[in-house]
């Protein structure tokens, strides 16, 4: 009886503390009594104290039971930040892919540039080697004209001749003005002193890709050396091929900074000589003020007249330039429409390589301009030649030839009537 009283007393306390699970515990009590029937009397006297001590210890054990699922939920939360970490790796790989693509693009670009650089203008000769070369002067005594350039370019140093560029207008203007009887090219530069009294020199001897690579010190020294050359050979006319050259020369030699420089004869002479100074437009095709060769011929014609005047040669009244007008806008439009390709490339420069230009363009028939300087119109009357009839596709078109008078000592009656009109 005492054991039963103690068991009921302990159950009442447990029921007071745990009201909700009381029914479940009551269902398990008979089984506990059966299994522990022999041990209960020994533990019964201290049962009250044991239950009193165990109840508060068991209470906190059941309290975190609802928190256990929270911990389980936290585990996936803790794992959630790891999930985006895995896609970050392919993100970095994407960046690397972009970088590889950009590298591929850069490689393609560099390959394209390498292809352009492989264009061999000088047949294997490096630019550094050309910079060490110089262009020899073509000077002698009793010259009528000395053409003065700034300094040799790469092509001139490579060819070893003056004004070798196909786009340069010098040789065309020389022929169109009548200073030479036939069309010449850079390979004929050494023959000009004996045939036409024309020589060549430069203000600075050093070869550069452009005149901008020269220093002011080189211009000063070059100006002094040029004066010494002109004082030695004393030509009749010193022709400066471009305004820029004469402006530098005038400042260094005469001490005069020219303002509003005009082409043609200048007021100053070379010191201690009777050599006149004459300024022409640059024969380079890059001259924006005169984009075509025919725009520069006027100043070559005036140079020829000045030379004849100094030599005492009477001018032909039938063949002379009465009036000259120039419209830059019309010239630029005309150059774009008609003469752009012709100005950039001249078949005449193939003569050095045994090209078609070296052959006789007339083929035994009368030409537009004969070798003796007389026009074909003075020999036999012919119809106007179409531009396609120009031999070997030369640069001079029939439309422009009509604008330039023939430079000969005798003219036809038709030319006389036109000149008087």
UniProtKB/Swiss-Prot annotation:
SUPFAM superfamilies assigned to the protein according to its UniProt record, in alphabetical order: Uracil-DNA glycosylase-like
Keyword Ribosomal protein: no
Location within or outside the cell: Nucleus
InterPro entries: MUG/TDG, TDG-like_euk, Uracil-DNA_glycosylase-like, Uracil-DNA_glycosylase-like_sf
Region feature Disordered, mapped onto this chain: 45-108
A biological process term (GO) from this entry: base-excision repair, AP site formation
E.C. number: 3.2.2.29
Posttranslational modification: Sumoylation on Lys-341 by either SUMO1 or SUMO2 induces dissociation of the product DNA.
Biased composition (Basic residues): 91-100
Result after altering residue 151 to A: Loss of DNA glycosylase activity
Cross-link (Glycyl lysine isopeptide (Lys-Gly) (interchain with G-Cter in SUMO)): 341
Observed effect of gene inactivation: Embryonic lethality between 10.5 and 12.5 dpc. Embryos display specific patterning defects of the developing heart; vasculogenesis defects of dorsal aortae, carotid arteries and branchial arteries. Global defects of angiogenesis are also observed. Defects are due to epigenetic aberrations affecting the expression of developmental genes, coincident with imbalanced histone modification and CpG methylation at promoters of affected genes.
GO cellular component: nucleus; plasma membrane; PML body
Cross-link (Glycyl lysine isopeptide (Lys-Gly) (interchain with G-Cter in SUMO2)): 114, 259, 341
Gene Ontology molecular function: ATP binding; chloride ion binding; DNA binding; DNA N-glycosylase activity; DNA-binding transcription factor binding; double-stranded DNA binding; G/T mismatch-specific thymine-DNA glycosylase activity; G/U mismatch-specific uracil-DNA glycosylase activity
Biased composition (Basic and acidic residues): 77-89
Enzymatic reactions: Hydrolyzes mismatched double-stranded DNA and polynucleotides, releasing free thymine
UniProt keyword terms in alphabetical order: Activator, Chromatin regulator, DNA damage, DNA repair, Hydrolase, Isopeptide bond, Nucleus, Transcription, Transcription regulation, Ubl conjugation
Family according to the record: Belongs to the uracil-DNA glycosylase (UDG) superfamily. TDG/mug family.
NCBIfam families documented for this protein: mug
UniProt subunit comment: Homodimer. Interacts with AICDA and GADD45A.
Protein name per Swiss-Prot or TrEMBL: G/T mismatch-specific thymine DNA glycosylase
Organism, scientific name: Mus musculus
The gene coding this protein: Tdg
């Amino acid at each position: 009886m005492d054991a039963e009283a103690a068991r009921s007393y302990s159950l009442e306390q447990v029921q007071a503390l745990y009201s909700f699970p009381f029914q479940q515990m009551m269902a398990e009590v008979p089984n506990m009594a059966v299994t522990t029937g022999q041990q209960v009397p020994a533990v019964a006297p201290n049962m009250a104290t044991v239950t009193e001590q165990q109840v508060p210890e068991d209470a906190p054990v059941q309290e975190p039971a609802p928190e256990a699922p929270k911990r389980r939920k936290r585990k996936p939360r803790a794992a959630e930040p790891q999930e985006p970490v895995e896609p970050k790796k392919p993100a970095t790989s994407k960046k690397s892919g972009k970088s590889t693509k950009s590298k591929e693009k850069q490689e393609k670009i560099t390959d394209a540039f390498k292809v352009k650089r492989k264009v061999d203008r000088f047949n294997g000769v490096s630019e550094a080697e050309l910079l060490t070369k110089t262009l020899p002067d073509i000077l002698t005594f009793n010259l009528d004209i000395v053409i003065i350039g700034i300094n040799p370019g790469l092509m001139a140093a490579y060819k070893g001749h003056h004004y070798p560029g196909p786009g340069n207008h010098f040789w065309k203007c020389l022929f169109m003005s009548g200073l030479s009887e036939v069309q010449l090219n850079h390979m004929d530069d050494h023959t000009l002193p004996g045939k036409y009294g024309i020589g060549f020199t430069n203000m600075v001897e050093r070869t550069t890709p452009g005149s901008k690579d020269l220093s002011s010190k080189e211009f000063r020294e070059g100006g002094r050396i040029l004066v010494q050359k002109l004082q030695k050979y004393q030509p009749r006319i010193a022709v400066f091929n471009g305004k820029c050259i004469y402006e530098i020369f005038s400042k260094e030699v005469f001490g005069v900074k020219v303002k509003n420089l005009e082409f043609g004869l200048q007021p100053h002479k070379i010191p201690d000589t009777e050599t006149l100074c004459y300024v022409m437009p640059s024969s380079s095709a890059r001259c924006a003020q005169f984009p075509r060769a025919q725009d520069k011929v006027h100043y070559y014609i005036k140079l020829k007249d000045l030379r004849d005047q100094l030599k005492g040669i009477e001018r032909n009244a039938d063949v002379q330039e009465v009036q000259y007008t120039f419209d830059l806008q019309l010239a630029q439009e005309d150059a774009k429409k008609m003469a752009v390709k012709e100005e950039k490339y001249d078949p005449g420069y193939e003569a050095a390589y045994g090209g078609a230009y070296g052959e006789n363009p007339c083929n035994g028939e009368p030409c537009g301009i004969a070798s003796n300087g007389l026009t074909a119109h003075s020999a036999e009357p012919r119809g106007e030649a179409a531009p396609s009839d120009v031999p070997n596709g030369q640069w001079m078109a029939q439309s422009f030839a009509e604008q330039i008078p023939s430079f000969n000592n005798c003219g036809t009656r038709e030319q006389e009537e036109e000149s008087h009109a």
